[in-house]
């Protein structure tokens, strides 16, 4: 029986081969077609970057962004593949650019006014098609931007000088509130409280608990940064989102109470002409049916968190740089004495504070806080010879560009880098074009007011061995010091105003 089974005469070999060959041929053809598809996909892009390799490339690049943070991942990829390269984020083709000519092209054209990020993540924090910062609906973004532009320029900018100077003086008079037992100053907390107080006085005008709101703002920012590029599956696992949900809710609930108080005051006021601020304008727009209630609340929230979130960290880095460079401090103090003297700072002083302005610019170049810009192409285009398809994500790596082009000593902190006029295409800390930072002018003026008011009263020092270069930092959506790992306090020594130039 066994021999019969093994005997080939019992089988029609020809028929067996004819059945097997088509199946094998189909399998080979399918495999060949698949490999050609993958090969063709990779060949369609002449832009440098990691390999697609059966979809593994996009998975790895997205994981790298989640693991390293957006800013650190951008620096890694630009260093690896050049100043114009391609990766994938959330499965979407994403360009990372640190070349000035390409950045200039993206920023100046209106078909790059949209940003990108996880829709579910932005919905989670309330920014999806609301507010201004990450509102990716061009029509809705255009509807709210004029409110921000009006509030951050003209009379609002002039009022800010006095309000900000008064806030700094008030907080410096209560410096013990942000000092530890050794008398060291928690500069980040101090700056965040000053920025929040100034923003509130300018844009909302409702008394609030600074210390509590500052903590809630930090929690909200952490959630925003953590969720911006998370894959959709993350939001289906409730326990992963719970911590962020609480942080977002804490700030939104606190803001809701403040905004409701604002609405009440508006509805009961006999006269509003002399006190129409940013929040009032938005609430009137809501009453006219131009904006939704949720959008109004988000706009006010974003206006109040912007300065405590970024400008406070910028000034923190500046004070560390001043402490390390006494010759810069001397030049600043000399200019303050010449331009301002012993009187209060005024709006007409701003153009005369050239050393202070150069110092601010060099600080933002050397140690940026916002060192990237995220955009999305709304139509097909060509950038520096590379084809860019509609829907492509783009990250402009400003921090890297500021150390690659034009500046004579790009890797050093020195005011020589701004001794001559810098063409604006080579230095863009706030961006430019239709989606430039709406607060770029008021931010510069506010930083001048902070530095002048603080430095005329105090000489600043870091703790031994502390400096910006050695500080542990997190470079994600923005670049912040790691507050869990470093001693970030400073020593404030009161100046003798009559002898401040002798130091």
Swiss-Prot record:
GO biological process: female gonad development; lipid metabolic process; response to estradiol
Reported function: A cytochrome P450 monooxygenase that catalyzes the conversion of C19 androgens, androst-4-ene-3,17-dione (androstenedione) and testosterone to the C18 estrogens, estrone and estradiol, respectively. Catalyzes three successive oxidations of C19 androgens: two conventional oxidations at C19 yielding 19-hydroxy and 19-oxo/19-aldehyde derivatives, followed by a third oxidative aromatization step that involves C1-beta hydrogen abstraction combined with cleavage of the C10-C19 bond to yield a phenolic A ring and formic acid.
Cofactor: heme
Gene this protein is translated from: CYP19A1
Official protein name in the record: Aromatase
GO cellular component labels: endoplasmic reticulum; endoplasmic reticulum membrane
Key words, A-Z: Endoplasmic reticulum, Heme, Iron, Lipid metabolism, Membrane, Metal-binding, Microsome, Monooxygenase, Oxidoreductase, Transmembrane, Transmembrane helix
Entry EC number(s): 1.14.14.14
Sequence positions that bind heme: 437
SUPFAM superfamilies, A to Z: Cytochrome P450
GO molecular function: aromatase activity; estrogen 2-hydroxylase activity; heme binding; iron ion binding
Pathway: Steroid hormone biosynthesis
Reaction(s) this enzyme catalyzes, per UniProt: testosterone + 3 reduced [NADPH--hemoprotein reductase] + 3 O2 = 17beta-estradiol + formate + 3 oxidized [NADPH--hemoprotein reductase] + 4 H2O + 4 H(+); androst-4-ene-3,17-dione + 3 reduced [NADPH--hemoprotein reductase] + 3 O2 = estrone + formate + 3 oxidized [NADPH--hemoprotein reductase] + 4 H2O + 4 H(+); androst-4-ene-3,17-dione + reduced [NADPH--hemoprotein reductase] + O2 = 19-hydroxyandrost-4-ene-3,17-dione + oxidized [NADPH--hemoprotein reductase] + H2O + H(+); 19-hydroxyandrost-4-ene-3,17-dione + reduced [NADPH--hemoprotein reductase] + O2 = 19-oxo-androst-4-ene-3,17-dione + oxidized [NADPH--hemoprotein reductase] + 2 H2O + H(+)
Membrane spanning stretches: 19-39, 53-73
Topological category with respect to the lipid bilayer: Multi-pass membrane protein
Provenance organism: Bos taurus (Bovine)
Family: Belongs to the cytochrome P450 family.
Pfam families: p450
Binding residues for substrate: 309, 374
Location relative to the cell: Endoplasmic reticulum membrane; Microsome membrane
């Amino acid at each position: 029986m066994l021999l019969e089974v093994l005997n080939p005469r019992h089988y029609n070999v020809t028929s067996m081969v004819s059945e097997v060959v088509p199946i094998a041929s189909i399998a080979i053809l399918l495999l060949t077609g698949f490999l050609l598809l993958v090969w063709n996909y990779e060949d369609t892009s002449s832009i440098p970057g990691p390999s697609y390799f059966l979809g593994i490339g996009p998975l790895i690049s997205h994981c790298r962004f989640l693991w390293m943070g957006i800013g650190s991942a951008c620096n890694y990829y630009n260093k690896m593949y050049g100043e114009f390269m391609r990766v994938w984020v959330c499965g979407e083709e994403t360009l990372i650019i640190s070349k000035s000519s390409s950045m200039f092209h993206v920023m100046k054209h209106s078909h790059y006014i949209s940003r990108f990020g996880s829709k579910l993540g932005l919905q989670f924090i309330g920014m999806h098609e609301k507010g201004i910062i990450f509102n990716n609906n061009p029509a809705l973004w255009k509807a709210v931007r004029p409110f921000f532009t009006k509030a951050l320029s003209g009379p609002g900018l002039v009022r800010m000088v006095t309000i900000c100077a008064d806030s700094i003086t008030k907080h410096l008079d209560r410096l013990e509130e942000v000092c530890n037992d050794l008398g060291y100053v928690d500069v980040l907390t101090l700056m965040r409280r000053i920025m929040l107080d100034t923003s509130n006085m300018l844009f909302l005008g409702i008394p609030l608990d600074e210390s509590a709101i500052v903590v809630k703002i930090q929690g909200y920012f952490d959630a925003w940064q953590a969720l911006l590029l998370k894959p959709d599956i993350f939001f289906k696992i409730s326990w992963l989102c719970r911590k962020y949900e609480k942080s977002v809710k804490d700030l939104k609930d606190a803001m809701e109470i403040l905004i409701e108080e604002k609405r009440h005051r508006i509805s009961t006021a006999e006269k509003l002409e002399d006190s129409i601020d940013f929040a009032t304008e938005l609430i009137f727009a809501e009453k006219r049916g131009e904006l939704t209630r949720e959008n109004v609340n988000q706009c006010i929230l974003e206006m109040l968190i912007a300065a405590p979130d970024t400008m406070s960290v910028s000034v923190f880095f500046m004070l560390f740089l001043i402490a390390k460079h006494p010759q810069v401090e001397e030049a600043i103090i000399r200019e303050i004495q010449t331009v301002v003297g012993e009187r209060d700072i005024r709006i007409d002083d701003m153009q005369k504070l050239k050393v202070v302005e150069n110092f601010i610019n060099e600080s933002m170049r050397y140690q940026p806080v916002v060192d990237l810009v995220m955009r999305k192409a709304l139509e097909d285009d060509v950038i520096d010879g590379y084809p860019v398809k509609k829907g492509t994500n783009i990250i402009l790596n400003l921090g890297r560009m500021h150390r690659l082009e034009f500046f004579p000593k790009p890797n050093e902190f020195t005011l020589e880098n701004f001794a001559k006029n810098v063409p604006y295409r080579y230095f863009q800390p706030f961006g430019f074009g239709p989606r430039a930072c709406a607060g770029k002018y008021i931010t510069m003026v506010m930083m001048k007011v902070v530095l002048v008011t603080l430095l005329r009263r105090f000489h600043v020092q870091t703790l031994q061995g502390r400096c910006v270069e050695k500080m542990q930092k997190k470079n994600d959506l923005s670049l912040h010091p790691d507050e869990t790992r470093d001693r970030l306090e400073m020593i404030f020594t009161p100046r003798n105003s009559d002898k401040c130039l002798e130091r």
